[in-house]
């Protein structure tokens, strides 16, 4: 004889909950990865059936506490990282694990709400960035490959904007490889260390490395002076406007087959050419290199 459910219930376990929560039933049944606690203990492991003192979803405890109490082993290192971090990602600071992780089931590892690359997940909150990316012709490699976490910590870190490594946001900065540590996780350091090159960069006048000339000095220009970070409307993510204090100054950059030219607002245009070095540039570069030598002393 089939026993009736206790307490006058019409059903038991997840079947009882799914009588109303049909959308969650579909998520669980159609997903590749099922949260272990849902599989082993069902809904009441995390939810009260009648009432709750928490802020939403009749949770037995507040969201962060609920997750950490079960995932103690996995979150031990993470909680230490968060506790010592100078910058905490907003969903983490607010205890919203479910902002990025599906609490019931998911088609992606670690129960992420989107994947396998993290751009769709990040763009679910960062909608302005999503629109800017959509409208841009040239996307930075990590954006193009859908890997925000190549540069950003998803939970917490010690650099503003949740960046993994240091990134200087000023226009001028004394040359130090550490200042560019984020960029040089992908880009070669030699691009700012070699005075001359025929292959490291196309930004050169003959074989004179103009990256070195701009960056490797006491009053060096930072990456941000010329390049957009995420995407841009010009090749190599060259800016149309460069931030300078409270101003934004037009660069007026034009690319040619063998070089380019720019004129920063009030300044006369400057040109460079890889095949036919511009003489005026050579003379000016020599003077600047002398300045660099003096600064080094």
Question: At which residue positions do the language-model features occur?
Answer:
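Short sequence/structural segments immediately N-terminal
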Residues: 1-297
